[in-house]
Design a protein with these regions (language model features):
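Linker/hinge segments immediately adjacent to helix-turn-helix/homeobox DNA-binding domains
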Residues: 394, 406, 420, 449-512, ...
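Amphipathic alpha-helical segments of tetratricopeptide repeats
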Residues: 32-40, 73-81, 94, 111-118, ...
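Tandem amphipathic alpha-helical repeat scaffolds
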Residues: 18-24, 47-60, 86-102, 125-143, ...
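Residues within the DNA-recognition helix of helix-turn-helix
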Residues: 272, 460, 544-547
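Residue signature of alpha-solenoid helical repeat architecture, marking inter-repeat boundaries
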Residues: 9, 43, 79, 83, ...
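Single-residue signature of alpha-solenoid repeat helices
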Residues: 31, 65, 105-106, 147, ...
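Alpha-helical segment of the N-proximal tetratricopeptide repeat
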Residues: 11-37
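Helix-turn-helix DNA-binding segment
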Residues: 410, 419, 443, 485, ...
Length: 570
């Protein structure tokens, strides 16, 4: 992170000004060339080195950026310029933390900046330090209450020192911190204000615009307002196209997959995540873990549990791995382990981190109801309901209805459970949450079966199964098939615990995408040609072929085509 840089000690240098103008235009290569020449021509000019470091950062040339910034820092220190030295120390903290993932080194530079600023009057650099304090508390400790206090200080200092850019980002972080505490409407109002100011031209540094939009998207994700999140992702993509910064593009791609996962658009989600992982492995290996965790969650939902586990091992240390591991335990019919992981996660999350606690509470209540721990489940359901009532978005209200319904079912109050779960389905559908809606339908079907209403239970189960198979949600689809078997055999009402998983899944119809692939195979196209025709990766086509052949119980492409023709699939 950085703020506008003061004028050079020798502004008459034409080459330096050419580099400065190139930075403003986003002409990164020209900026690097001009600023390198300026630094070589005037090696004692700290501003030239500082600007060169900025240009290298835009081009993701981290080592060169750090080298240039360290040179600038030394020159500013030599001339006794504590304010500029502190600014560059903050820029070095950014490089080490964001690009290299070296938190300890980054903290060293933050503390150096803090000491340099201690005796100086309030400035934009002081405001930027408070922004960093807020960011580090949110990222490292997950404590939105403390983060809000830092952000509010940053807003106040920026206003006094007329540091408009950093003040807008501080305002966005204050809003994000409020959302994290469950004060969603208050926080989103601040985020709307910050975003409007950024789009209205009050932000001159493109990085501030980008980070302000990221705060908005993160807040939307926390309250599960993914329609709003998608709108901001599209705006952020336009920004990335304008400024041609690969790191921003990749980060935007990952944020976008949150909405795709929620909406059940998993083919596109998979392509975006695989591309993001490849880009991060190449350009910023230290930042790849977040994308790996999200890909692990997708693989889990697809029923590829072993692959999900492998990805989580690779992403070890990322704070979100515990949540996916708990879900994996549920997929493997191990609610005791799921509950243990979820409880540990909740112990680590502060009470103030209300929206961050929701996912762990959902897992915990589902696990406890499977274990028949009704009183414990009521406690978790009560906390989640309190959060949902405070945040008051449709998706969180639906999550509250689900845990209340599961708890009612575990207490054998099946009519109450059915009503709560049916209301959840409607809310999820209104929020375009295809996967969550289908999963809740299965819960409705279990309640109907427990009430002896087998015909309605069959209808709900078949609808859920169709939706899950269309998405490629194999883990939940297999649960639906097992439930369908039990309802059809008349044993579902007496079986409250999940049935033991069989090694061989029940064969179901092909998804829409699998039928498209099979039709192109019938035309004689290769996987590479199919990928080009459908705008997919070749790897994704391979996966579709493997899945459809497994579903059709055949071992060759020709046999798949023959069966597809026979069964009217193509």
């Amino acid at each position: 992170m950085r703020i506008m840089i003061q004028e050079s000690s020798d502004p008459g240098l034409e080459v330096l000004e050419r580099g400065r103008r190139a930075l403003v235009r986003g002409a990164w290569e020209e900026a690097v060339d001009s600023l390198r020449a300026a630094a070589e021509e005037s090696p004692a000019d700290a501003t030239a080195w500082e600007l060169l470091g900025t240009a290298h950062m835009w081009r993701q040339e981290t080592d060169s950026a750090i080298e240039a910034r360290q040179q600038a820092y030394a020159l500013y220190r030599d001339r006794g310029d504590d304010l500029s030295s502190a600014r560059v120390a903050l820029e070095l903290a950014e490089a080490f933390f964001e690009a290299r993932g070296e938190a300890a080194v980054a903290n060293g530079w933050l503390q150096r900046a803090r000491r340099l600023l201690e005796e100086l009057p309030p400035s934009g650099e002081h405001a930027l330090l408070k922004v960093w304090d807020c960011y580090m508390v949110l990222m490292g400790e997950g404590d939105p209450a403390t983060a809000e206090a830092h952000a509010a200080e940053g807003v106040a200092i920026a206003r006094k020192s007329e540091a408009r850019d950093v003040g807008i980002l501080a305002l966005a972080l204050q809003g994000l911190s409020q959302v994290g505490q469950g004060r969603a409407h208050e926080g989103l109002d601040l985020l709307d204000e910050a975003a409007a100011a950024a789009m209205g031209g009050e932000v001159t540094d493109p990085q501030w615009f980008y980070l302000t939009c990221c705060c908005m998207i993160d807040a939307c994700d926390q309250v599960r307002d993914y329609e709003r999140s998608m709108e901001w992702c599209h705006r952020l993509r336009e920004f990335c196209d304008r400024w041609q910064v690969q790191a921003f593009r990749t980060a935007c791609r990952i944020k976008y997959t949150g909405a795709l996962l929620w909406r059940g658009e998993w083919v596109q989600c998979e392509e975006e995540l695989e591309r993001a992982v490849a880009e991060l492995r190449r350009d910023r290996p230290s930042a790849v873990t977040g994308a790996l965790v999200r890909l692990a969650e997708l693989r889990r939902r697809q029923g590829r549990l072993d692959r999900a586990e492998e990805l989580l091992e690779e992403a070890r240390g990322h704070p979100m791995t515990s949540q996916v591991r708990a879900e994996l335990a549920l997929d493997r019919d191990d609610p005791a382990s799921a509950a243990e992981i979820a409880e540990a996660l909740l112990r680590r999350l502060p009470e103030s981190a209300r929206t961050e606690r929701v996912a762990a509470l959902e897992i915990l209540v589902r696990a406890q109801t499977e274990l028949k721990q009704v009183e414990e489940a009521r406690t978790g359901a009560s906390e989640l309901t309190s959060i949902a009532d405070q945040v008051n978005t449709p998706a969180l209200r639906a999550a509250s209805l689900v845990v209340r319904g599961l708890t009612a079912g575990a207490a054998l109050k099946h009519e109450e459970a059915k009503d709560l779960l049916e209301d959840a389905v409607h809310l999820f559908e209104d929020a375009n949450a295809r996967f969550a809606a289908a999963r809740a339908r299965l819960d409705v079907a279990r309640s109907l079966a427990a009430l002896g209403r087998d015909s309605a239970a069959l209808s709900e189960t078949r609808t859920a199964l169709r939706l899950l198979e269309e998405m490629g949600a194999e883990a939940e689809a297999e649960r639906a098939r097992r439930l369908l078997d039990r309802v059809e055999s008349g044993t579902a009402g007496s079986e409250q615990a999940p049935a033991v998983r069989t090694n061989k899944p029940r064969r179901g119809p092909l998804t829409r995408r699998q039928r498209e692939v099979l039709a192109l195979v019938a035309e004689g196209l290769s996987d590479r040609e199919i990928a080009a025709r459908l705008y997919l990766s070749e790897h994704t086509v391979h996966r579709h072929m493997a899945n459809l052949m497994s579903r059709l119980e055949v071992n060759s492409r020709s046999a798949a085509v023959a069966r597809g023709v026979r069964e009217g699939l193509i």
